[in-house]
């Protein structure tokens, strides 16, 4: 009963428990670390039970253990430092180290003494040389040598002044000026004919009209007059010229077949055709005018009657550097006033119509030309109104048209189009200045996308 009461936490027989409390508690196997307290405040009996863990250390005991461990470590560290100092002291006091120090000090002292001796010897030698030079300068031979050196210096100075004055006089002579102008002219021709062709394409700083052409300066210094006897033709209006040219182009089967074959020939990427193209171009340049009289020779002869200074190579260079860039840039950028000045009326209407429609819808032209190459004179044709030269060339163009929001409406800024152009340039008989006499009579183009 007592055990049951104890397990329930309350004892129902206080007297009995008090009488045999010690015996009762000792007769039970209690858990390790448990303690029981029986008290009687007043007449009530209270049994208190508490437990403590015997295996868990207290905070103070753990702290003491840590302090002991740190002290043990410090002791080991002190012993290690002491041993290191002892070893260093033994090394410091060793005979080998003492001997090495003595040798180093002796070498250092010898070096200092040697440097001082060399310095002293140099001072003595300098003084001796100075005294010897003073003695030589005071002697007759020394004075003569000194006077000779001074005389040579004066002579050299006078010679330099004389050469300078002679150079100035030579530069003012007419012969020297003529030679200088000739050298400058040759250099300018080389820059224009060689360097200008091999360099990359550059857009003109400002698109110019024919009247603003670079040859306008030439126009001021010369007066051009028409040779009516040599010409033997009557001047006509643009509409009649264009109509005659259009009839010839549309109805002549040989002309159309020729250009169809030439376009395929020029656009071919075949290695053999490209090699043969270079060979045929060279042979044509060398032997083109040695045989029978051709229509091209008649056209060139007619041009020479009007303009005796005309040259085929110079004309092609003019097309590549001025005529083609101005017209082509005006076409892709929508510069209508430039086109109107360079083109005949019918050609201008044909080119201006799509540009005017695009501008009316608010579109913007952002196309650009990357390169112009292979400018060639294909053929010539004598028309009633005057000579017409057919010029072919290739151009690499990026075609881009954007709307008012800046979005790409047509074209692709990342795609390069290789264009093959055929232009018919007619010499304006009303314009006597050869640098502004050529106008665009007709234009034809075909395009292919360039992969590389």
UniProtKB/Swiss-Prot annotation:
Residue list for modification Phosphoserine: 180
Membrane topology: Peripheral membrane protein
GO molecular function: ATP binding; protein-folding chaperone binding
InterPro entries, alphabetized: NTF2-like_dom_sf, Tim44, Tim44-like, Tim44-like_dom
GO cellular component terms, A-Z: fibrillar center; mitochondrial inner membrane; mitochondrial matrix; mitochondrion; TIM23 mitochondrial import inner membrane translocase complex
SMART domains xref list: Tim44 (SM00978)
Main location: mitochondrion
Signal peptide per UniProt: none
One record GO biological process: protein import into mitochondrial matrix
Record-listed N6-succinyllysine modification sites: 177, 217
Domain of life: Eukaryota
Subcellular location: Mitochondrion inner membrane
Gene3D superfamilies per UniProt: 3.10.450.240
The keyword Protein transport belongs to this UniProt entry's keyword annotation: yes
Binding site for ATP: 166-173
Pfam families (UniProt xref): Tim44
Sequence positions bearing Phosphothreonine: 128
Keywords annotated in UniProt: ATP-binding, Membrane, Mitochondrion, Mitochondrion inner membrane, Nucleotide-binding, Phosphoprotein, Protein transport, Transit peptide, Translocation, Transport
Family: Belongs to the Tim44 family.
Subunit composition and interactions: Probable component of the PAM complex at least composed of a mitochondrial HSP70 protein, GRPEL1 or GRPEL2, TIMM44, TIMM16/PAM16 and TIMM14/DNAJC19. The complex interacts with the TIMM23 component of the TIM23 complex. Interacts with SLC25A4/ANT1 and SLC25A5/ANT2; leading to inhibit the presequence translocase TIMM23, thereby promoting stabilization of PINK1.
Known function: Essential component of the PAM complex, a complex required for the translocation of transit peptide-containing proteins from the inner membrane into the mitochondrial matrix in an ATP-dependent manner. Recruits mitochondrial HSP70 to drive protein translocation into the matrix using ATP as an energy source.
Protein name, per record: Mitochondrial import inner membrane translocase subunit TIM44
Gene name linked to the record: Timm44
């Amino acid at each position: 009963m007592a055990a049951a009461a104890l397990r329930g936490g309350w004892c129902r027989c206080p007297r009995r428990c008090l009488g045999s409390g010690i015996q009762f508690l000792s007769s039970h196997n209690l858990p390790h670390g448990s303690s029981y307290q029986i008290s009687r405040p007043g007449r009530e009996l209270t049994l208190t039970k508490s437990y403590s863990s015997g295996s868990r250390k207290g905070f103070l005991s753990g702290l003491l253990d840590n302090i002991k461990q740190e002290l043990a470590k410090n002791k080991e560290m002190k012993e290690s430092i002491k041993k290191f100092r002892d070893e260093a002291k033994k090394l410091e006091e060793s005979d080998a180290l003492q001997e090495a120090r003595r040798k180093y000090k002796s070498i250092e002292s010898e070096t200092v003494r040697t440097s001082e001796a060399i310095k002293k010897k140099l001072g003595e030698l300098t003084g001796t040389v100075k005294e010897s030079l003073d003695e030589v300068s005071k002697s007759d031979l020394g004075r003569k040598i000194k006077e000779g050196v001074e005389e040579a210096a004066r002579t050299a100075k006078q010679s330099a002044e004389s050469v300078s004055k002679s150079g100035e006089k030579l530069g003012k002579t007419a012969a020297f000026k003529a030679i200088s102008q000739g050298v400058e002219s040759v250099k300018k021709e080389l820059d224009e004919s060689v360097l200008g062709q091999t360099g990359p394409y550059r857009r003109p700083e400002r698109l110019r009209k024919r009247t603003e052409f670079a040859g306008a300066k030439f126009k001021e210094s010369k007066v051009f007059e028409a040779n009516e006897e040599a010409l033997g033709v009557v001047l006509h209006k643009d509409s009649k010229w264009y109509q005659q040219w259009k009839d010839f182009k549309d109805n002549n089967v040989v002309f159309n077949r020729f250009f169809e074959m030439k376009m395929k020939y020029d656009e071919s990427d075949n290695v053999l055709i490209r090699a043969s193209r270079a060979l045929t171009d060279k042979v044509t340049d060398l032997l083109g005018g040695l045989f029978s009289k051709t229509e091209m020779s008649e056209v060139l002869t007619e041009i020479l009657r009007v303009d005796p200074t005309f040259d085929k190579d110079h004309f092609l260079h003019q097309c590549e550097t001025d005529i083609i860039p101005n017209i082509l840039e005006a076409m892709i950028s929508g510069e209508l006033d430039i086109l109107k000045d360079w083109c005949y009326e019918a050609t201008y209407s044909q080119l201006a119509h799509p540009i005017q429609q695009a501008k009316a819808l608010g579109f913007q032209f952002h196309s650009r030309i990357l390169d112009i190459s292979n400018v060639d004179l294909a053929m010539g044709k004598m028309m009633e109104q005057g000579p017409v030269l057919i010029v072919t060339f290739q151009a690499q163009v990026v075609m881009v048209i954007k709307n008012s929001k800046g979005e790409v409406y047509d074209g692709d800024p990342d795609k390069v189009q290789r264009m093959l152009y055929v232009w018919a340039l007619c010499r304006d008989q009303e314009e006597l200045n050869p640098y502004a006499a050529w106008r665009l009579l007709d234009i034809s183009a075909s395009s292919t996308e360039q992969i590389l």
